[in-house]
Amino acid sequence: MYFIFGNLTPRFALKPVSLKVQKNESRDKKLKERWETLLVVLNERFSDGEVIDVEGVLYLVGLQELGQVHRKMKKDDNVNLIHIGICSVLEPYGYYRFDFFDDDGWPHFELLEELPALKAGEQSILMKEALVEYFLKRQLIQ
């Protein structure tokens, strides 16, 4: 099996984290720095000139979790990869739980709790925070 982020297994135990989106300047500054570092690392590895956005990072996480990086993907597969990315990064927050791999090797998740209604800015912060945590746990960034 080949993984896009090195010799990492796609699934391993993650500690639960809190969803609370807090207004804390030093925390926000640290998140911004880590997010920008993550984008630099991912853009250097995977971009052909276009800047990777949140959706692109979720796609890469989905691809990593699927573990089938050389497989030719269909349009529907791309949407499913983003969904896998969302489930994977929000799993430590208690919203999803990995359930099983299907016969084609695709991971399936169980929805444990509906996501709260968040404003667009809060959604963006949550996803960036969850993505940064995902890559911190995998030691791609510090």
Q: Each predicted region: which residue ranges?
A:
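N-terminal amphipathic/basic-hydrophobic helices that include classical n-h-c signal peptides
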Residues: 1-22
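Helix-rich interaction surfaces within compact, conserved domain-sized segments
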Residues: 115-141
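Amphipathic alpha-helical interaction surfaces
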Residues: 67, 88-96, 133, 137
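N-terminal interaction modules that seed assembly of large macromolecular complexes
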Residues: 45-74, 82
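Ser/Thr/Pro-rich, acidic low-complexity intrinsically disordered regulatory segments
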Residues: 25-29, 34-40, 68, 125
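Intrinsic, low-complexity terminal and presequence regions
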Residues: 21-27, 56-59, 114-117
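Amphipathic protein-protein interaction modules
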Residues: 73-123
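Short runs of predominantly hydrophobic/aromatic residues within well-ordered alpha helices
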Residues: 35, 51-57, 78-83, 123-128
